[in-house]
């Protein structure tokens, strides 16, 4: 039976462009498999939060074409997504896409799609908290030393300078990485070889308008690895690990998105290191109850395995690591969509109706409450 799919893309997010690129590649893959999947509709959220809907081919390709679609109010857009038996495959990267926002909408509306649990996505967008969870779940797993700038610093430049000076003293001349806590794609992430107080303050101030939580981490030199994980046939499977080789030893936004700045080394045969990466990835994926698929990033330094972050909706664009890992495992993007739809059918559904017995009187007077000491 052919699977009907709605592609949901765009979003009011700093990763809007990544969503458009993932959409184009996935749409092309789905159109190449007409006997397996039917593209039922395209739902686009503009950068400003408007909703556009397309239910017939030819499907939009450019952002101008997407913006020219039927403009819908929110309630009607949600109604169309929940109407019928189509599976909604979300490509909403970043804020308001994979941070728990749309996952909550999907839970409340029983929206059939690859959204998954609220907590897994919310945790997946919070680098500081997921590091705490990861260390607890995987014995021996390390994370870089981290300091978080208090949100109030965005309104107090003097306090920001004082905080930055204190962190610079704790770093004691060691290089640092400054990054937003709740953004993806390494946006606004900077390496500071000489993290003086003023340098830390400037880098933190640049990120604060986009995220009220900014992290300063001690830079750990080493080799970066990324591991994809998918649910196939009801089982959690680690994909072949990719080692990221860069000229400057750091995998930032430019390295991830400009051709030739990173040399991905695909490990089709496991080593001791890649086995450790896979084991940690599967454990974290399962324990965090991530839905469908994810990508997890690690770093190895002096034989110590450092956890960097989990991405609960990795990019599917050309040049992204996740499709490369899928291909090495004998899978493609059409398989991924089909597996997500099958996994949705296998998910556990909580019973939310339970008798809640209350033995107190229906109404109590003020005098009775005062007498009882409440």
Which positions does each model-derived feature cover?
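A glycine- and small-aliphatic-rich helix-loop capping segment at beta-alpha/alpha-beta transitions
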Residues: 104-112, 194-198, 329-331
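Short, surface-exposed beta-strand-loop junctions and turns on beta-sheet-rich folds
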Residues: 59-60, 233, 314
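Active-site nucleotide/adenylate-binding loops and adjacent lid/helix of ATP-dependent enzymes
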Residues: 2-9, 78, 123-215, 221
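Helix N-cap/coil-helix junction residues
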Residues: 111, 139-141, 290, 331
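ATP-dependent carboxylate activation and anion-phosphoryl transfer catalytic cores
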Residues: 3, 271-374
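Phosphate-binding site of ATP-dependent enzymes
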Residues: 193-279, 300, 304-306
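ATP-binding N-terminal substructure of ATP-dependent carboxylate-amine bond-forming enzymes
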Residues: 1-119, 123-125, 129, 150-162, ...
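Structural element of the ATP-grasp superfamily
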Residues: 106, 130-134, 326
